[in-house]
């Protein structure tokens, strides 16, 4: 029987299918569409892994609330993940950890964190990226979300005069008790006008900034809501995952908890956070070498490259509350209170379900979206898989949010979960001592490596099973299918491969070797600096580096359609360049972007090509390339470098400023987005600026430039430059008046042509 490959397209999105074929040289695939399915899957898994049915009705929200700790009922097939945490075991592990690190270890760490927190300014909260904004109920940049929250305090009670993080935290706790909260909100008013020519009625939507208010109950749900999105940029996966972003009311408290956890992680040698890069490699290397020192002559080690299944769904906020209570037991009352707020808020969190579920008919010709609020009403239309997801959770859902007392969502409390993981690596008991076995390892959030040490193979087996059992008690599930053991000093940890020493992983740097697409001047220098860095890190051998340099050159020429002057390649751009090259005597001085040849080799990677060719250039050509008054000359201090894995790296720009260092501007229009209300506010601000300027002419105010056409923008810029030139004495008053007249005529012509 032949298999028809096109059948695969019937039940899968084309976008998700394409994502499996993405190459490592390009950017990773982005996720599209609704994230509701992934969110529902996460919530259902969290409830399933609790392995219990003990529920009480929540007094605050009147929703059934499941218990996630100390109540394991279903003990069948414990190989599968379990998220039920035994609190007494957790406290026992924390005690062992403190004993090993020395008495007063936690107290000292919390004191360090306290001094930092007391100095912290609440503007530190603007550092995050996307944040859930409770006033507009959608995602905003962190700074905007913070501003809107501060505005809400101002509207309800008066201006917020605090400056430190603690004052902001106190205000947030006060807000949770207010009976009514007012905040700014953009409303659209529909106006009907008659068109004078056609006589038809025209509807226009006008955004108006108004003030809205909500009651205490509604605010409590909004404050505890965590928004979910589909995770972008995952390679080689058909199914997407949901990630979370909390609101500005939860953020300050989680920041405090993370500060405390960071101070602990810095002092634990098994922790892979918060350091990174070469510093992390050095830390791991010392852990591995110290293991060899601890072993006896008759013992041997096995390395296990571990994988935890469903890490986030099995982490419990209640367990974090107990752990933080133990960590802060000898500390000040202030820290005891502050650290307990974040886990309590997470114990009562609501998860936003997203845009809704997409349905289509059997022939895939029509599609419709059921919104999250109406999913209960149109249950009968759903496919079986959606029904099975939705029905068990129906009693926990209110409008478009779902009550989830247990489980964490991706990206929350990374440091604290590392402390929890390291506590299992510190475990030791009498039985292990009697058999002469022990274990140690490395932990970085949900990624870990285990070094199991024993004298024979049967004891090794027993040690690993013992470790697995200890982890199960506190909700960490080592996946037996995905974890593999190998000989000593051979493992992988957070995408770093270790074989006696760290082996380079060149695939991660591949996109960085290609042309970045900034401009002709920066691109080649940036690629050369990456090759140089990788040679220093032992990632590239000289021969591979030479190959990388040649590939870079070929791609650079193909991107900018510039080939060597004697290659006889035809093309629109090469025609223009060849005419210009005829006028130059010494052709060795030509830059690559002007049809020159490569002069750099491996030993001169750190020298930009402009410097190498400076002496060989014709004087006229040199003056043209390095002319600071040329409008194309521009210099940026930093440059963004893309990688196959992890965030964009920002490096120093080592390129020499030449006429090839131009910058292209993106034309961004706000007219057809829902940011028009911001523009309306900007216009009002502009009016005030103009009034102020008309009274105080010497005042130095930068008025915002609102909605403008390109023509208006050019005129504005020309006038500004002319005025500046006149002020410094570069042009005379008569010339300035002449320029003004020319611009006025151009404006007149432009308006008449309309």
Curated annotation (Swiss-Prot):
<dbReference type="GO" id="GO:0003968">
    <property type="term" value="F:RNA-directed RNA polymerase activity"/>
</dbReference>
<keyword id="KW-1190">Host gene expression shutoff by virus</keyword>
<dbReference type="GO" id="GO:0019083">
    <property type="term" value="P:viral transcription"/>
</dbReference>
<feature type="short sequence motif" description="Nuclear localization signal">
    <location>
        <begin position="189"/>
        <end position="197"/>
    </location>
</feature>
<dbReference type="GO" id="GO:0042025">
    <property type="term" value="C:host cell nucleus"/>
</dbReference>
<comment type="similarity">
    <text>Belongs to the influenza viruses polymerase PB1 family.</text>
</comment>
<keyword id="KW-1195">Viral transcription</keyword>
<dbReference type="InterPro" id="IPR001407">
    <property type="entry name" value="RNA_pol_PB1_influenza"/>
</dbReference>
<keyword id="KW-1035">Host cytoplasm</keyword>
<feature type="region of interest" description="Promoter-binding site">
    <location>
        <begin position="251"/>
        <end position="258"/>
    </location>
</feature>
<dbReference type="GO" id="GO:0000166">
    <property type="term" value="F:nucleotide binding"/>
</dbReference>
<keyword id="KW-0945">Host-virus interaction</keyword>
<keyword id="KW-0693">Viral RNA replication</keyword>
<dbReference type="Pfam" id="PF00602">
    <property type="entry name" value="Flu_PB1"/>
</dbReference>
<dbReference type="GO" id="GO:0003723">
    <property type="term" value="F:RNA binding"/>
</dbReference>
<dbReference type="GO" id="GO:0039523">
    <property type="term" value="P:symbiont-mediated suppression of host mRNA transcription via inhibition of RNA polymerase II activity"/>
</dbReference>
<keyword id="KW-0547">Nucleotide-binding</keyword>
<keyword id="KW-0696">RNA-directed RNA polymerase</keyword>
<keyword id="KW-0597">Phosphoprotein</keyword>
<comment type="function">
    <text>RNA-dependent RNA polymerase which is responsible for replication and transcription of virus RNA segments. The transcription of viral mRNAs occurs by a unique mechanism called cap-snatching. 5' methylated caps of cellular mRNAs are cleaved after 10-13 nucleotides by PA. In turn, these short capped RNAs are used as primers by PB1 for transcription of viral mRNAs. During virus replication, PB1 initiates RNA synthesis and copy vRNA into complementary RNA (cRNA) which in turn serves as a template for the production of more vRNAs.</text>
</comment>
<protein>
    <recommendedName>
        <fullName>RNA-directed RNA polymerase catalytic subunit</fullName>
        <ecNumber>2.7.7.48</ecNumber>
    </recommendedName>
</protein>
<feature type="short sequence motif" description="Nuclear localization signal">
    <location>
        <begin position="205"/>
        <end position="218"/>
    </location>
</feature>
<dbReference type="GO" id="GO:0030430">
    <property type="term" value="C:host cell cytoplasm"/>
</dbReference>
<keyword id="KW-0808">Transferase</keyword>
<dbReference type="GO" id="GO:0039657">
    <property type="term" value="P:symbiont-mediated suppression of host gene expression"/>
</dbReference>
<keyword id="KW-1048">Host nucleus</keyword>
<feature type="domain" description="RdRp catalytic">
    <location>
        <begin position="288"/>
        <end position="484"/>
    </location>
</feature>
<dbReference type="InterPro" id="IPR007099">
    <property type="entry name" value="RNA-dir_pol_NSvirus"/>
</dbReference>
<keyword id="KW-0548">Nucleotidyltransferase</keyword>
<keyword id="KW-1262">Eukaryotic host gene expression shutoff by virus</keyword>
<keyword id="KW-1104">Inhibition of host RNA polymerase II by virus</keyword>
<dbReference type="GO" id="GO:0039694">
    <property type="term" value="P:viral RNA genome replication"/>
</dbReference>
<keyword id="KW-1191">Eukaryotic host transcription shutoff by virus</keyword>
<dbReference type="GO" id="GO:0006351">
    <property type="term" value="P:DNA-templated transcription"/>
</dbReference>
<comment type="subunit">
    <text>Influenza RNA polymerase is composed of three subunits: PB1, PB2 and PA. Interacts (via N-terminus) with PA (via C-terminus). Interacts (via C-terminus) with PB2 (via N-terminus); this interaction is essential for transcription initiation.</text>
</comment>
């Amino acid at each position: 029987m032949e298999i028809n490959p096109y059948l695969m397209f019937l039940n899968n999105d084309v976008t998700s299918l394409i994502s499996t074929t993405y190459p490592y040289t390009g950017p990773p695939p982005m996720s599209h569409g609704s994230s509701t399915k992934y969110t529902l899957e996460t919530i259902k898994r969290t409830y399933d892994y609790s392995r219990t049915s003990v529920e009480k009705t929540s007094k605050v929200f009147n929703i059934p609330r499941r218990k996630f700790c100390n109540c394991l009922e279903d003990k069948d097939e414990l190989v599968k993940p379990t998220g039920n945490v035994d609190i007494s075991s957790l406290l026992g592990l924390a005690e062992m950890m403190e004993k090993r690190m020395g008495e007063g270890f936690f107290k000292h760490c919390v004191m360090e964190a306290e001094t930092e927190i007391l100095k912290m300014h609440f503007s530190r909260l603007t550092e995050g990226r996307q944040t859930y904004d409770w006033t507009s109920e959608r995602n905003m940049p962190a700074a905007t979300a913070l501003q809107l929250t501060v505005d809400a305090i101002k509207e309800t009670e008066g201006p917020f005069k605090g400056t430190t993080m603690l004052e902001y935290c106190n205000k947030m706790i006060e807000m949770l008790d207010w009976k009514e909260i007012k905040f700014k909100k953009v409303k659209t008013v529909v106006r009907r006008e008659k068109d004078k020519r056609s006589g038809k009625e025209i509807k226009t939507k006008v955004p108006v900034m108004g003030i809205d208010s909500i009651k205490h109950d509604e605010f409590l749900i909004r404050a505890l809501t965590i928004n979910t999105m589909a995770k972008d940029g995952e390679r080689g996966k058909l199914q997407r995952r949901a990630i979370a972003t909390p609101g500005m009311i939860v953020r300050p408290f989680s920041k405090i908890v993370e500060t405390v956890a960071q101070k602990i992680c810095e002092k634990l040698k098994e922790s892979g956070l918060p350091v990174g890069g070469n510093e992390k490699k050095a830390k791991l290397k010392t852990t591995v070498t110290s293991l060899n020192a601890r072993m006896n002559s008759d013992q041997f080690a096995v390395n296990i490259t571990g994988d935890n299944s469903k890490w986030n769904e099995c982490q419990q906020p209640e367990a974090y509350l107990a752990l933080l209570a133990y960590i802060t037991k000898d500390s000040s009352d202030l820290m005891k209170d502050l650290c307990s707020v974040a886990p309590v808020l997470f114990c009562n969190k609501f998860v936003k379900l997203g845009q809704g579920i997409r349905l289509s008919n059997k022939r895939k010709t029509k599609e419709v979206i059921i919104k999250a609020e109406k999913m209960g009403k149109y249950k009968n239309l759903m496919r079986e898989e959606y029904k099975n997801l939705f029905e068990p959770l129906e009693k926990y859902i209110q409008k478009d949010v779902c009550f989830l007392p247990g489980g964490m969502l991706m990206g929350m409390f990374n440091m604290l979960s590392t402390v929890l993981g390291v506590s299992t690596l510190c475990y030791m008991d009498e039985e292990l001592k009697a058999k002469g076995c022990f274990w140690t390892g490395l932990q970085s959030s949900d990624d870990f490596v285990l070094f199991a040490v024993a004298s024979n193979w049967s004891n090794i087996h027993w040690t690993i099973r013992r470790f697995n059992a200890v982890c199960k008690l506190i909700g960490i599930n080592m996946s037996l299918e995905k974890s593999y053991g190998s000989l000593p000093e051979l493992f992988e940890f957070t995408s770093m491969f270790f074989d006696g020493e760290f082996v380079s992983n060149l695939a991660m740097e591949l996109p960085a070797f290609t042309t970045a697409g900034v401009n002709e001047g920066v691109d080649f220098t940036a690629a050369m600096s990456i090759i140089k860095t990788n040679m220093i890190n032992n990632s590239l051998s000289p021969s591979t580096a030479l190959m990388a340099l040649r590939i870079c050159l070929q791609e650079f020429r193909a991107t900018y359609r510039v080939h060597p002057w004697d290659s006889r390649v035809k093309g629109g751009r090469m025609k223009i360049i060849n005419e210009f090259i005829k006028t130059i005597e010494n052709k060795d001085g030509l830059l690559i972007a002007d049809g020159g040849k490569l002069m750099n080799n491996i030993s001169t990677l750190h020298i930009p090509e402009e410097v190498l060719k400076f002496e060989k250039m014709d004087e006229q050509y040199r003056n043209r390339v390095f002319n600071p008054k040329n409008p194309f000359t521009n210099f940026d201090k930093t440059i963004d470098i893309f990688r196959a894995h992890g965030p964009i790296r920002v490096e120093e720009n080592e390129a020499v400023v030449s006429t090839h260092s131009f910058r292209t501007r993106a034309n961004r229009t706000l007219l057809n987005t829902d940011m028009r209300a911001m523009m309306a506010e900007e216009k009002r601000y502009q009016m005030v600026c103009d009034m102020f300027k008309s009274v105080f002419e010497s005042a130095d105010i930068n008025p915002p430039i609102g909605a403008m056409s390109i023509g208006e923008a050019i005129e504005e810029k020309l006038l500004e430059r002319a005025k500046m030139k006149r002020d410094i004495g570069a042009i005379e008053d008569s010339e300035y008046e002449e320029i003004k007249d020319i611009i006025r005529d151009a404006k007149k012509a432009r308006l008449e042509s309309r």
